[in-house]
From Swiss-Prot:
Belongs to the AceK family. It comes from the Bacteria. GO terms for molecular function: [isocitrate dehydrogenase (NADP+)] kinase activity; AMP binding; ATP binding; phosphoprotein phosphatase activity; protein serine/threonine kinase activity. It catalyses: L-seryl-[isocitrate dehydrogenase] + ATP = O-phospho-L-seryl-[isocitrate dehydrogenase] + ADP + H(+). Keywords: ATP-binding, Cytoplasm, Glyoxylate bypass, Hydrolase, Kinase, Nucleotide-binding, Protein phosphatase, Serine/threonine-protein kinase, Transferase, Tricarboxylic acid cycle. InterPro entries: AceK_kinase (IPR046855), AceK_regulatory (IPR046854), Isocitrate_DH_AceK (IPR010452). ATP binds at A327, P328, G329, I330, K331, G332, L333, K348. The gene is aceK. This is Isocitrate dehydrogenase kinase/phosphatase. Pfam families: AceK_kinase (PF06315), AceK_regulatory (PF20423). Its main location: cytoplasm. Signal peptide: none annotated. Bifunctional enzyme which can phosphorylate or dephosphorylate isocitrate dehydrogenase (IDH) on a specific serine residue. This is a regulatory mechanism which enables bacteria to bypass the Krebs cycle via the glyoxylate shunt in response to the source of carbon. When bacteria are grown on glucose, IDH is fully active and unphosphorylated, but when grown on acetate or ethanol, the activity of IDH declines drastically concomitant with its phosphorylation. Transmembrane segments: none annotated.
Length: 612
């Protein structure tokens, strides 16, 4: 039943709605300014500046919400406004959004502000946006004609090489390219190698999103090729080959490759979008099946992603009947983890008490999760969604899970009618725990898992992350076969750690002792000792020593620490090194620096490529 008033008579209701929308508009203006500034930082090669910009943007949303709440409380005494006025506030807000370019994000901002002011019992359809009120279909861009949401190119007129070159130059990047003709030839060769020669259909065209996607040391051109009924996704990373000189590093042509660069284990892109829903819709066409919640999150609108995820969860609960259960695997000392088998996520709660040897607090653990949220995750640390006051139907909770919840996290529980309200939780993508993957896998699986594990830890080292607890159970294997770290309660900056070699035993008694015969400080790490708990399985040992024998050498860890202390930032590639043009077409890069006249665009067979 609709309880909304027939007439909107409250001036205060309109004023509050307008104040809240002004708060959102300020937030989104700052959000876009960050993406615009990312272009300048990328052009200058200011990688530390880009890192700081990405970190600061993550906290910007909550800061704008708090500003808006404070303003509403100071000017309107918002907590004392009665329910009839709150109903009108929402209706006025809907009216103000009818021509807005980011209505879905503005609705989420409204919810965030309301949930700071109102008690949970008021979170109902009348007061907040449980479902979207404004459609995001066919929202038009207000930008100049030079920057629509995406540009369409028609290679039939000027040829594919000229079209590809125009696509790149239209982004008007300040640095020069080392050899754009060479790089375009590599793109054409890669397309030919992947798909062969195709006939052009009458609708043959290339669509390219008008903004670059910035992350780490790369800027990505993202688009799709249309030919007949076929749609081919692509992404082209641009990188500095030396200060002030750019090159196209590769072209990613497989959906799986794009899913990895847009995955939950990577940091959010910096990308300028006037109409975010149009970008999300476009990205959905090149990554079909990827939830909109994850796409919004990957482009930096994590609060909108979080909102959509919760709606997806509620929708799934209403169309499923299985029960939440304790997650399979070894139970953690710090976190209680449960899952819904039909839903590909896990729910993680910080326990009330931690048995020895754990020495930590709830606040410290939450700070570790916030550290990961703000850090560059490099595709090796799982992103988390943090929620408060999540109501789950008691009937959907397995009895064993309820007993575990009441035993381990009673302070987080509140029964409310037929629901169990959980005061705080983290939600992550469900992965196969690495220990189970290794335990149940064949020899090929074990080799892959160990190779990935070593790569993951080494990349975390380079990103200044020391995992702390490196047992296999704290890592997971994604659906793409990548190993990702997801247990953060002991995480530290590598630069805060003291890398040490194990001192030689002083005598036979030391050598036979089960306890260290040397002093161990709180931040001391001893890589030589890790083999004790990592190499028990002969298959694991064989693969480990084949691919990562240096893992247990303190010099490796110290070398990474020294590079970090010097302010050096290594290169990371969220795709196989073999896919880089300099590796798959090395003949094109011979004497690149000194070559005066570039080679032709492509070999004869590639010049006549017809894209499908």
């Amino acid at each position: 039943m609709n309880h909304f008033p027939k007439l909107l008579s409250s001036q205060i209701g309109f004023d509050l709605a307008q104040t809240m929308l002004e708060g959102f508009d300020r937030h989104y203006r700052i959000f876009r300014d960050a993406a615009i500034h990312a272009k300048t930082l990328f052009e200058k090669g200011d990688w530390h500046g880009l890192q700081k910009l990405a970190r600061d943007r993550i906290t910007s949303y909550d800061e704008r919400v708090d500003e808006c709440v404070e303003l509403l409380e100071d000017e309107y005494d918002a907590e004392k406004i009665d329910s009839e006025v709150w109903q009108q506030i929402k209706l006025h807000y809907i009216g103000l959004l009818t021509t807005h370019r980011q209505p879905e994000c503005a609705e989420t901002f409204f919810n965030s502000v309301c949930c700071k002011i109102l008690h949970r019992s008021y979170f109902n359809n009348d007061f907040i946006f449980v479902r979207p009120a404004i459609s995001t279909e066919y929202i038009e861009n207000d930008e100049p004609a030079a920057k629509p949401t995406y540009r369409a190119y028609y290679p039939g007129k000027d040829g594919l090489a000229a079209t590809l070159e125009r696509i790149v130059t239209n982004f008007q990047l300040e640095p020069q390219f080392e050899d754009l003709t060479r790089d375009v030839g590599c793109v054409m060769q890669a397309i030919h190698d992947a798909f062969g020669a195709f006939d052009e259909a009458p609708n043959f065209q290339i669509h390219v999103l008008s903004s670059l996607f910035y992350r780490n040391k790369s800027a990505y051109i993202v688009g799709r090729i249309i030919n007949g009924d076929l749609l081919l996704p692509f992404a082209v990373p641009l990188r500095h080959v030396k200060p002030g000189v750019l090159a196209l590093d590769t072209v990613l042509l497989k959906r799986e490759q794009l899913l990895i660069i847009f995955s939950f284990s990577h940091s959010y892109f910096l990308v300028d979008m006037e109409v975010p829903s149009a970008y999300v819709e476009f990205l959905g066409t090149i990554m079909p099946g990827k939830p909109k919640a994850e796409i919004y999150t990957s482009v930096g609108l994590q609060k909108q992603g979080k909102n959509l995820f919760y709606r997806d969860l509620l929708h799934h609960l209403s169309h499923s009947s299985d029960q939440f259960i304790i997650a399979p695997g070894i139970k953690g000392l710090v976190m209680l983890v449960f899952t819904l088998p039909s839903f590909p996520y896990v729910f993680k709660l910080i326990k009330d008490n931690f048995p020895p040897p754990k020495e930590t607090t709830r606040a410290q653990i939450q700070s570790k999760y916030q550290l990961v949220k703000r850090h560059d995750r490099l595709g090796r640390m799982a992103d988390t969604l943090e929620y408060s006051s999540v109501a789950l139907p008691r009937s959907r909770l397995d009895d064993a899970l309820v007993r575990e919840l009441e035993k381990e996290v009673p302070s987080l529980l509140e029964y409310e009618g037929e629901n169990l309200v959980i005061r705080h939780m983290y939600i992550e993508r469900r992965m196969v725990p690495l220990n189970l993957f290794l335990q149940n896998g064949n020899d090929e699986d074990v080799e892959h898992g160990i190779k990935e594990y070593g790569n993951a830890v080494k990349e975390l080292m380079q990103a200044n992350i020391f995992p702390g607890d490196m047992l296999y159970k704290n890592f997971g294997v994604t659906r793409h076969g990548r190993v990702v770290f997801y247990d953060y309660d002991e995480i530290e900056y590598l630069t805060d750690c003291n890398v040490r070699a194990v001192p030689a035993p002083r005598n036979e008694e030391d050598e036979m002792s089960g306890e260290p015969w040397y002093s161990v400080g709180p931040h001391d790490i001893f890589p030589e000792t890790y083999g004790t708990f990592l190499l028990g399985d002969p298959r694991v040992r064989r693969s480990f020593m084949q691919h990562h024998a240096d893992f247990f050498d303190p010099a490796l860890w110290q070398r990474h620490k020294d590079h970090l202390l010097k302010g050096e930032l290594p290169d990371f590639f969220p795709y196989d090194d073999s896919a880089r043009f300099c590796n798959c077409y090395p003949e094109r890069f011979a004497d690149a620096a000194g070559r005066a006249s570039p080679e032709p665009d492509a070999p004869a067979d590639a010049r006549s490529v017809r894209v499908a």
